[in-house]
Amino acid sequence: MSTTDENLICIITAFWQLVNTVFWYSAIAVYCTTGMKIITVTGYKGGVAKSTTSVHLATYFSDKGKTVLLDGDPNRTAIAWSERGDNKMPFIAVDQRQAVKFVTGSDYIIIDTPARPDSDDLKELAKGCDLMILPTAPDVLSLQPMLEIAKDLGATKANFRALVTIVPPHPSTEGKQMRDELELGGVPVFKTTIRRTVGFPKAALAGVPIRDLDDARLRIAWADYQNLGKEIEELLK
């Protein structure tokens, strides 16, 4: 084990003992191995496909290298998703207590945080990752909170992007309207949007990513996350 790996283990262990997940996440970045990329998925409220996004980004990046999904959500949604499929996911899903064993030597770490972090927590989370993703539903009630969050993060010069999720199917224009409003408000936002589909709950129930469901109609939903993954790769270069 390298000195860097030993340092990483020590810092994770120490911060877990403090039982402060926000600062624990930030600490990972301090001693991460060269080339490791940390992507944090967080949201100011629940029900915005945060864990769905974490699971499918972990699936995407598992084709690029060793990927670990750190599930910090008290509901353990990502871990439960994986366990329902007998842990046959192409990535490793663990909580903070298991991270010491699995995180070293990873190429990608996807962090699924608790929902509703406050402004200070968001800033700390942003310091501890290479990219922060903020899923948001395409509705007017989500717009103002996202503008306020972006203002707070913009002051820290953090690398973050909003992601419009749960987008209704054509002919609805809600997804495009939300993207346009975010851009007008100065919020960096992904070009890719994630459409709403019954396939995601089915995948969660089966314990697999949506790409593994035997339904050709759902391939377009997986394509959304493939396109998102490609955007992220460009941002992390």
Segments (PLM) and residue ranges:
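P-loop NTPase switch/communication element
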Residues: P74-P90
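Switch II (G3) loop of P-loop NTPases
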Residues: V103-L122
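Beta-strand-loop-alpha "switch" segments that mediate conformational coupling across diverse proteins
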Residues: M178-R211
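G-domain G4 guanine-recognition motif of GTPases
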Residues: A137, R161-G175, T192-A203
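Inter-motif core of Ras-like GTPase G domains
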Residues: D120-D139
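Extreme N-terminal, non-catalytic leader segments
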Residues: S2-I38
